[in-house]
Amino acid sequence: MGTVEKSSNNDASVTDDIRSAEYYHGMVPRQDAEGFLKREGDFLVRKTEQMPGKVVLAMSVRVTDELCRHFMLNMDPTSNKFYFEHTHQESTISELINWHMTTKTPISAASGAKIRRPMERSPWLINHDSIVANKKLGEGAFGDVFIAELDQGGKQEVAVKTMRAEATREARLRFMKEARLMRKYQHKHVVKLIGVAIHEHPLMIVMEYCPNGSLLSHLKKNKVSLIEKLRFTTEAADGIAYLERSKCIHRDIAARNCLLSAKNELKISDFGMSDNKDEIKDETLEKVPIKWLAPETMQEKVYTHKTDIWTFGVLVWEIYSDGAEPYPGLTKIQTRAKIVVNDYRMKMPDGTHPTVADVVTGTCWQKNPEKRSTMDSIHKKLREFYESKK
């Protein structure tokens, strides 16, 4: 029998036999768990927070095409045996699961839920012992960011975002939502998700490492040529156009959130505020970068794919101004007033290619969102112009 980490109220916690089981998915959220279970009888075991600070084990089962059920695993404090809802008991969790599978006995009489196929962990669910943190890069919204070495049959350098152990359940769900979104995206100008480590704390998002750092830092530290600025602009448009086609509203497009690969190729990163929706309402607008917001976001607290196009225009201004802060000399409050009340637009920096300036001022910064073009058409125009200049 594996070692039991006991928890109160007869709830079972992780045992050694479960930790190594292929159907154990760690702290995968309910929404992700249900997405993994495709056919009736598919099941997995996961950790879940029953109440603040109390993490227990649960089994998720696909009961019908439309319905998944979730069952707590319990331990009898007298016999030290495991059971579901006061039914059959076994000495280990794996033996209990095997009994229900082989006898085809429902997990509970009321649900009728039978388990048939264990859902093995996906390749992108990474074991913590495969990751060795090397150097701290900085701090993110949820925790620290590191350069690390990932060993999965071959070593590679990766970037790892961590989640503080003391983070709230809501913060953990946001963290996992970011990973879930990134998992969908495969594009040369979008940072690639390699996987997540969620069996224990700290939770980790493992991504491709971009050794040349942020675009903002590169612009500030180096003398960047006009043709390279045009390339950055075109690559950013390519990545954002892909996200638009993927129905992703990024909400935080800025030079600080663009990373550079070893070949200095631009990649869109940081999906902490993103979502797959046509419209997002944010009633608070807390901790948002005011100087990058579209007028309708400032006034109506709404984000759409068209607000990302406005923000792309601000990113282009950053690129051609060598990483200067937008609306120089203005506070956030002054910026908001000038845009909303006075319909103010920044002048594009000296040296900006006229074609690029026309895209920004004539398309991206249209007051009426419906008059802003699509990112696909913006990228097409910029790509053709860049090709003519190479």
Swiss-Prot record:
Its EC number is 2.7.10.2. One of its GO terms (molecular function) is metal ion binding. ATP binds at residues 137-145, 161. It is found in: Nucleus; Cytoplasm; Cell junction; Cell membrane. Disruption phenotype: RNAi-mediated knockdown causes a disruption in the dorsal intercalation and ventral migration of epidermal cells, preventing enclosure and elongation of the embryo. Epidermal cells tend to round up and appear to be defective in adhesion. In addition, causes partial nuclear re-localization of hmp-2 in the embryonic epidermis and the production of supernumerary gut nuclei probably resulting from epithelial cell hyperproliferation. GO terms for biological process: canonical Wnt signaling pathway; cell differentiation; cell surface receptor protein tyrosine kinase signaling pathway; cell-cell adhesion; embryonic body morphogenesis; negative regulation of canonical Wnt signaling pathway; negative regulation of cell division; positive regulation of cell population proliferation. It is a peripheral membrane protein. The active site is at residue 252. Residues 23-119 form the SH2 domain. Its cofactor is Mn(2+). One of its GO terms (cellular component) is cell-cell junction. SMART domains: SH2 (SM00252), TyrKc (SM00219). Residues 131-386 form the Protein kinase domain. Non-receptor tyrosine-protein kinase which plays a role in morphogenesis by regulating the epidermal enclosure of the embryo, independently of its kinase activity. Prevents hyperactivation of the Wnt signaling pathway during endoderm development, probably by preventing hmp-2 nuclear translocation. This is Fer-related kinase 1. The gene is frk-1.
